[in-house]
Amino acid sequence: MIRKYNRSNVYIHNMAKFDIIFLLKYLVKLGSVQPIIHNDRIICINFNFGKNGEYQLQFRDSYLLLLNSLMKLCKAFKVENAKSIFPHFFVNENNLDYIGEVPDIKYFMDIKLADYNKYEANFNGNWNLKNEAIKYCELDCISLHQVIYKFTDMIYDLFQKNVHHYPTLPSLAFAIFRSKFMLEENIPQLSGKIAKDIRLGYTGGSVDMYIPENPEGTKVYAYDVNSLYPSQMESGLMPIGQPTYFEGDIRLIDPNAFGFFYCEIIAPDDINHPIIQTHVKTNKGIRTISPIGSWEDMIFSKEMDNAINHGYKFNILWGYTFEKENIFKDYVDFLYNLRSQYSKDNPMNFIAKILMNSLYGRFGMDDNFLEVNMIHKDYYPDFENKYLDNITQKIELGNYFLVTHKAIEELENDESTHNVSIGIASAITAYSRIHMSQFKNNPKINLYYTDTDSIYTDSDIDKSYIDSKTLGKLKLENICKRAIFLASKLYFLETESGKNIIKVKGLKDSSSLNYNDFKNLLNKNFLVEKSHNKWIRNLSESKINIIAQIYSIKVTDNKRLLIYDNNNKLISTENYKIDKNKTI
């Protein structure tokens, strides 16, 4: 801690999930610490030091600005000194003085054999653990500095914005949009009851498995939508201005009423691919599904209109109307055109992409902000007695407690805003589901699986849907010889070129899985178990424990009913049917 660095920013990549676990306990002993935490993630830490706390550093997580690994960022920004590799799992308390052969590839994290061989060739039995650890850490710092330096320069040249004023990418994207592209302050900052009401119907992308396996000899085509959310932001009318509350069926008075309507929803029984999502209660917690049946929920008016065309019926009970306007077209068009001017390996392409995809996140951010205070143990009992019901977490750090609690000034008045507009976010996700609905219940398209922005089908797609260079159009990602879909984010693909694509949500390393594993999982109650490492973070003890755990992989009925044949093999799925209790 040196005075000349007063008011400097210290960037640490992935600080919240790694470095701060070791640092925070010691920073508390060296000065005054004020963390800013949102959704259990440390955004930044204000650190004051000196005799009277007159000097300040701010520790920031650069991952929140540049959402990628440091290795990939070095490639994207073409820095002079790129991040290296290191055998993290080789190090233990008994071999700190090790000198010898380069440790086996199994001790390195997520590297290719070619990269390992290239690294190993630099040594001749003289690999020194201590020296290489220091070199690795120093190079991490140098490469991160070069990435941030380039990023800062490019953002300022483009938009005259100082990156160091914004702790996250969505906050930077919003600042750029607000100063360069927003013509007037017409985005409503919704709070309190209105925000809670609209959030009732706020769901993300629709992910469903319909057919678990393709017949032998039948190819499955995997298509992605080109920049789904930005495409809908570019074309969609957004809810702006001040909302107006109404009761009854507003469409009887104003057939063009626009906003969010709380409705009784009746889905057609014969629909193959339901297109309206809702939150339901299960014995395993809350799930988001696309059911049939009848229930009540909040819905964006444009999504309601689209669903009517698919046979849904709605009885509007109450809601909020808004003015409407296309507010994002200039922002998205500028960034998309900028991106198209540069090759994918150019950092400008990367910057345009991340800014285009990050603005949406700002509007949908959870506005239930909590305050975090570092309270000395001597003063904590008084604080606890006064605010016990509002304390959500307490972590011991030496002579202090890191206390998370609801903001004191908001306890009596829940009308806080943080530049959050759930109406905008809800409209964007709704428009995106509307866009994807054109591929569902289409007699010309046989669907196996759909994700937020992708479809998997064995049908020939009309060429009018396809254009890899146009926002919102489909682009063919893969042609698959074999495909097995088991659940949301759980599938196996073998492409025509022989490449295996395996997706298992929650499993860090799926490389040991193969086609036969997924084939066997089609059998009822079959289970595949794999060992993987779980990182257990402990702020109080400044430790990260890596524990080997068994990860169980199986078919789930979280989203749809599973249909088995007489041999107990999974062959299809069916819609859940719900009523107003929304329980399955």
Describe the predicted segments one by one.
Residues 1-584:
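Conserved acidic
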